Amino acid sequence: MATKQPNSEEDFDSEFERKPMVDWFAPAQLFDSGMKVVLSNIFGVHADKREMQAALQQGSCFDYSSCQDDNGEFWLDYIADIGEGWNSTYSMAYLLAQEQLFFKDKDSGETKYLLIQEQLSELSDSGEKKKYLLTQEQLSELSDSGEKKEDFTKIKRGKILIMGGDEVYPTPTREEYRNRLIGPYQAALPSVKEAAVCPPVKEATACPPVKEAAHSSVKEKELPLPHLFTIPGNHDWYDGLTSFLRLFCQGHKIGGWQTRQNRSYFALKLPHNWWLWGIDIQFDSDLDKPQRDFFSEIAEKQMKKGDKVILCTAKPEWVFCALTKDSKCYDNLVRFEKEIICPNGVLVLTLSGDLHHYCRYETDKGTQQKITAGGGGAFLHATHNMPKKLLLDACGEENASEKPALDASAEENAVQKKVTYSRAKVFPEMKTSKRLALGAFLLPLKNWKFALFVGLFYQLYAWILLQGYAIMNGEKTLMAIIHGKLAVELVFTKFGLALLYGPAEVFTLLIVFGLWFFGKWKWKLDGLLHGIAHVLLNILLIWFLVYLNFSESALVLKNQEMLRVLLFFVEMIVVGGFLGSLLVGVYLVICSFLKINLNEAFACQSIPDYKNFLRLHIDKAGQLTVYPIGVKTVCKKWKWNPKAKEGESWFEPDDSRGTLPHLIEGSLQIKLPNN
């Protein structure tokens, strides 16, 4: 049944709130995120609902091997790290919803145009811009060239949409899922015009027939396409997976996409002996036994020798093991690959999100690809810290760099069973990523709540230091210090005594060693220097503001002592907040060039642009091709479509600078080991 369109944009806004990007540096958000991480790490393992799912529900295995279109082709879409700000999330949902996209490549391989089918047919002699997707210059150039739709590569909407983790931010509440995910996707594809239905599942195929679901009177085999499958990321796990299971595992529809799974992991049999597996790694933990048993049974009893596997996991552990020098989590993934996939199958492609950019690694032979495509709507992550080479365990002897030598030691053979992955492509480009990192300089302007918090902390620290200065130097009151002459040469002498005052000492240690604890560069020196810089800045601000307000040459509020004291503390909040948060921004920029704390350097900016998703295609010969689609600038203005037909989006782009997608690196044909 088609979702009824609201009568007006106002009616839509009364049902869904179009959320902005999350202010990750807002004090309340920082506290909430920190508590979520701590509580999840403490209780997450003890509240593992994956085993409960196995006890209550049959495993989610579905057969799409006979679901090709009339040309014998099969399409599916992949997107990850999705529901944050409306503009970025809806921009990607809008593109996913289009029935067909058209590309044309130049000789250089760069994308020249990306058009929606209706726009190609609506080009007029006047060159009028249709649906606001194309610029005037592009329309004129296309009209003058006389090119036709046949000159473009046609990219169809997937019959399946895979959401690869972190479907909502910052927390997986019912309200956040509704506003940040359901609203944008329902508006983008409220229904599907003339929806196709998969052929009945055959008894003899790999996956057994799916029984009638307890929550629905409609048999699974009769559910219209497209279908939706999801795996949870760490943000989906913050409530123990409660909201995720309610939304994605009970047969609900999200716009025109129909959910089917009943667990947080699934297996899909695709045409031409391709499989897609989606695994649930919880919080970087090992796979639970019921999940391993589920995939083991499929691999042993349902897969044929040589079947090709696309593996979807919520986190690119292959990257993190290189960045953090900790391979524990990646070892869990490798063990799953070696013990379950590789005995019968061939792992060809691994997809992940978690890092909010596009980054592809491939082996020297090109027979294994690992792609991070976390550009579904969340704030941008850096790319210039991505390692150039990765040395990883091989899944299957055919992928190892060398065969084990008979006379070699165990350690030598272990090294020989490694395979090198090279960084093939990133989006945004590394030079762009470095430039965007400089935006952290604007932290006090982009995050006024954080600046206010820093200012209040500076004011409190200043008051404690002045009290300590008074007591340690024999003064009775704070006013005695205010009336005294604080010369520059006294700042580092008598204030040194103030730092020995109990409360001042506690606060100083809290600042210095608190920031040292979060340091990441060479014995955490970056954090230590950062903390010392804040202490020195606060002392210098005290001297400057006292001199400005209470020196003999002060021009403000003479004979108004209490008002001048009040003014001093207000100035400390405002000036200290600005300079203190600016110091944090400077620290993050410096760290970005040291390739540390990059998550914070980009989180403080909440950049909505440089988004991406993948469109996968299996042709009639069984060749898998990946189309990585990127958007440099998401649309910021939208126009309500009051007369949207069935299958049409409720909001259309109204921003010539936004929603202009392109192929990030052209079409990527996946090579097989024996080809």
Predicted regions, residues:
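Acidic, histidine-bearing metal-coordination/catalytic regions of metal-dependent phosphoesterases
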Residues: 1-162, 168-232, 236-238, 242-272, ...
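Active-site-proximal beta-strand elements of phosphoester/diester hydrolases
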Residues: 73-84, 273-283, 310-314, 368-376, ...
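Active-site neighborhood of phospho(di)ester-bond hydrolases with catalytic His/Asp-centered motifs
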Residues: 79-80, 159-166, 227-234, 279, ...
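Active-site environment of divalent metal-dependent phosphoester hydrolases
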Residues: 85-87, 169-172, 235-241, 284-287, ...
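Conserved beta-sheet core of the metallophosphoesterase superfamily
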Residues: 230, 326-394, 580-611
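Active-site-proximal segments of metal-dependent phosphoesterases and phosphodiesterases across multiple
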Residues: 283-293, 302-348, 444, 449
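A short, polar/proline- and glycine-enriched secondary-structure boundary/capping micro-motif
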Residues: 287-290, 381-383, 635-641
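Membrane-proximal envelope and lipid/glycan-remodeling enzymes
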Residues: 308-310, 320-325, 335-336, 369-371, ...
